[in-house]
Amino acid sequence: MEQQKPYIPNNKVRIVTAAALFDGHDAAINIMRRIIQSTGVEVIHLGHDRSVEEVVNTAIQEDANAIAITSYQGGHNEYFKYMYDLLQEKGAGQIKIFGGGGGVILPSEIVELQAYGITRIYAPDDGRELGLQGMINDLVQQSDYAIGDKLTDEINHLEDKNPKAIARIISSAENFPDVAAKTLEDIHKKNENNTSPVPGITGTGGAGKSSLVDELVRRFLSDFPEKTIGLISVDPSKRKTGGALLGDRIRMNAINSPRVYMRSLATRQSNLALSKYVADAIQVIKAAKYDIIILETSGIGQSDTEIMDHSDVSLYVMTPEFGAATQLEKIDMLDFADLVAINKFDKRGALDAIRDVKKQYQRNHNLWDVNPDEMPVFGTIASQFNDPGMNTLYKA
């Protein structure tokens, strides 16, 4: 069979992917999201066993074009209909819903669901006829519409923390900067006296930044029941296809709260750790009067200090596996970071690592009169519940 060419989207398409609630079968959605991503789409992946409310809230906060769900657990009629109803109820009926579930979803049920308003449910026959890439081409083509090409009165709804308004202004700034220019100017004026702090979290890829952010958010929400938190999480775009896997939400368990707004951004440029729209996104969330805004970059290299331009206080996350101590002398962030977390502290050699990093931090910051043990370097295990190192870092 001849290999099909991927459809090339005309707009920046963002799609939320997940496997349905009580569904542990994530092999299918993983294959689909990889093909969707290689077709040039920014994929916000949630993993498996995700509730309708979680998926819908994500799609609204992320201003997605569509939702793609696999459902192999038999509850698809209720799941998809409830998702359609909830999107309508929340005023986000423009978000399209696609699904699939192999032979679990009967042909008669597919007809019923599509009549109800689901954009398309793919059957095994579609896979045979169209091929995998053909199905994804159809999905992406139907989801390929502009978002943010016009703004109405969104700015008036920011202070109500309306996720649709926040999301739409950020999308407009990303996709149609000319359309958003006037609104952003007004937002800058609004924010002149805004003092919401912006902690920036950066570090190497795979160091556990998202898990660490999740732990900080969980502690913040339980310590301050009245306060709200905004998150901006950046992941890299692929240079070859323009697609991106915005996968930070997979690790976030504490963000499903009405007090949290999270937005994932793709860098949309290669070899940089931040999107050039980060500053605008921060301003929009500040205007929505969130009490604290956490900015998380994509994985960075040794020489990257981009986060410093956007944050008030910076945390550098690394692991004990940095090689020889001389490698630390090359890491630019150790010159600038206010705090350093050595995550995955249960790995071998962690105690030697923290000693070396503390000494390097002392050298870089010329803190010769302070005991190296007092340097703001913390050993953390973000994947462990109530980890003492995480507690110490949070209090710092």
Q: Where are each of the predicted segments found?
A:
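Hydrophobic positions on the alpha1 helix immediately C-terminal to the Walker A/P-loop
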Residues: 212
